[in-house]
Amino acid sequence: MKKVLLILACGIAAPLSYAQATPKWAGKAKKAVFSIVTYDKDNKIKNTGNGFYINENGTALSDYTLFEGAERAVIINADSKELPVLRILGANSMYDIVKFNTETDKKTIALKSASQPASIGETVYLLPYSTQKAATCQTGTVTKVDTIGDKAYYYTLAMTTNEKTVSCPIMNANGEVLGLIQKNASDEAKESYAIGATYGASLSITALSLNDMSLNKIGIKKGLPETEDQALVYLFMASSQQNQDEYITTLNDFLEQYPNSADGYIRRATTYMGFNDDEHNALADADLKKALEVTANKSETQYNIAKLIYSYTISLGDKKPYGDWSYAKALSIIHDAMQADNQPIYTQLEGDILFAMKKYPEAYAAYEKVNQSSIASAATFYSAAKTKQLIEGTDMNEVIALMDSAVARFTKPYTSEAAPYFYERAEIKAQTGKYREAVIVYDTYFEAIGGGGTSAYD
């Protein structure tokens, strides 16, 4: 810490040497400005710079360059208190700006964004980081204002700045923040530039941010989207791009931000179950119970839990199940859901579970109900046909009729999606001695997969 403060102290004197004015609001406003130290993967100091708070929740802005390649970062506030950077909340490498949040130890002093952009010729104030009691400011004037987005601006200033003032705030006469100073080509340059604070505040994490190159070049943990729906899409994307431990961390962050999300608990339970051990299964079981506690749609949550336990039991093989997880438990849960809200998709799952339990007549009865509903499809008729085929004493013509209904769901020209159904239909016809009809269906199958061959019965 002493080493860090020594490095920072060397940079304090530079902006003070050309201080020209001290507005009344500067004494309080300077408490929003802090210094930043970033560290590399070996925990060695990578860069030092500045930043400032834009709200009392610890949200802040700084330059992207300072954070690029960093694995962690801390801020040292005006009271010389060191606080860790917790999450990156948005970044834009082209405009060299990053949004993040830090841990807070008490009420945070934050700068209020200006409601209107600065005008050309207006006097502005550069507020540097300082641990000194007295606040000092450097003045300059606005020479150009460019619009870079919705209520977002880029300022050209008649002001000489140096490396030590990068990411310090530019204020108007009312003590409102206009932007943050960007790195200049030369310390002797007569012009400086500032990116609008409102632009920085608008940066966010979206559902697609996992593929954002600018964000991925920062090793510090990222935040989540600000709406639950977007955050759930983010979780879906993360599930295929992160390993189990990373994904668990993301899920933990999600549930911290959205503690009443039944979907979040079910997704974390699913991930825990992927570890295939009793320790994680116990955590999964607790999450499934929590999902039922917080859900706004109990039947839907019961459906998702029943489906999860059903899938778990299928994958179990000859292994001993965890606790009471079984087909019977999954069936009991889906029956509870159906009593409150008898959706066809719930009946479909009921049929799947009964089929796995080898209760074929009951499974067929469930599939028949589905086939008379709005979600009837080639797949549901196929399920009914395969189940009917396994019931002792079944007339195979009934099975063929069900497969006829399955393929009737497709229209010409047939595609590869229809091919498996035509193949199964042909197989059943061949098994019942209807070889000529089977050949015709096999030919349709070959057409569907784009082949020119014919069946073995030619």
PLM feature spans:
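Alpha-helical segment of the N-proximal tetratricopeptide repeat
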Residues: 225-278, 318
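A conserved glycine-rich beta-strand in the N-terminal activation segment of trypsin-fold
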Residues: 21-22, 39-57, 63, 82-84, ...
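Conserved active-site neighborhood of the chymotrypsin/trypsin-like protease fold
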Residues: 55-127, 132-136, 151-154
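Residue-level recognition of tetratricopeptide repeat
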Residues: 270-274, 307, 314, 352, ...
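Structural motif corresponding to the intra-repeat A-B loop/turn of tetratricopeptide repeats
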Residues: 241, 275-278, 312, 324, ...
